[in-house]
Amino acid sequence: MLFHRGQLQQPAHLNSRSYPRPMKRLEDVKISTLDLVPVRHDKGPAESLRNSLNLAQHVEKLGYNRFWVAEHHNMDGIASSATAVLLAYLAGGTSTIRVGAGGIMLPNHAPLVVAEQFGTLASLYPDRIDLGLGRAPGSDQMTARALRRERSGSAEDFPDDVTELMEYLGPRTPDQKVIAVPGSGTNVPIWLLGSSLFSAQLAGMRGLPYAFASHFAPRYMHEAIRVYRNHFQPSAVLDKPYVMLGVPLSAADTDEQAEYLATSVYQRILALMRGHSLMQRPPVDSMDGLWLPHEREAVASFLGLAMVGGPEKIRAKLDVLLEQTDADELIFTCDMYKHEDRLRSYEILAQVAHG
């Protein structure tokens, strides 16, 4: 990983312009948005939630396929903890874009409750709701205990919990004693999410779409895709594998501006690693003096798939990514400090991807 003026640079293989034509053309790949609903250090969650809706409306007009938010707890810089409640707000303020959880951390919840929540959403907003499931707690162990109280759920229960949840959302069977109302028969589309090979294998064996968390854990991306595709079994949901990759985004009109705006993201990841506040900080001219060499390398690893640059650089990197992965869909997260910069970043991406 190379650096310039204290900022992150892409690995050489993503900077190269001499590469084969991708198996999929970027114009044919769906693009989506993952909003972490970031909270600024000088603002509060209320503005973050309003900005999330505004962003959803913005990308809907730009033709994005879906808008997801993720469950996180006990993090002062992320306002999407009440995920199902937030999704109702987002779906009610939009009209065509799919909205969903990317994802619900199933160890934190009883499958029946999740089925009822998302069954309600699907009843209110038919054919627009997605349910992505993760097996991590989305928090520290102390917070996980606070969420579960007397319950003993764990990641080891995840496969069985997924099965139970799918049964609640599917058609009622004659011998079914517990039903989700709303929920039963809604068949809310379920995705499996993950940053490990476990979730990749499970998604393949269940014939479910798979979203890999390459926006923060790119190290195992290629292996996870291979495992998912190799283990895929056709199902009532899918007849062939479907892979969506998470991608960090910092697009601007020039490469220099994009690199400058990305320093807010670098500071946020650095704070996460140090156990400090995750509230957003304004960009800086240089990260020199803010991180130690080993921290710089750790942030670089965390954001190894980040797309930072102007339109031409973003396009070149995305073409390489598709050539390497043959992904079916890309979902982008953009944590810029100013809301208007985030809006512009998604505009540039839409122009680059679909003209």
Briefly describe each language-model feature range:
Residues 31, 63, 71, 90, ...:
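Conserved, mostly hydrophobic/aromatic
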Residues 13-94:
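N-terminal beta1-alpha1-beta2 module of alpha/beta enzyme domains
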Residues 24-26, 87-95, 122-128, 204, ...:
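Acidic (Asp/Glu)-rich catalytic clusters
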Residues 27-45, 107-170, 210:
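Flexible, glycine-rich active-site loops centered on histidine and acidic residues
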Residues 31-35, 67-69, 99-101, 129-133, ...:
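Hydrophobic faces of well-ordered beta-strands that scaffold small-molecule active sites
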Residues 200, 204-216, 225:
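A conserved active-site cap/scaffold subdomain adjacent to cofactor or substrate pockets
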Residues 35-50, 104-111, 187-194, 302-309:
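Active-site mouth loops of central-metabolism enzymes
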Residues 21-27, 145, 151-179, 220-327:
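An alpha-helical appendage that flanks or caps ligand/catalytic pockets
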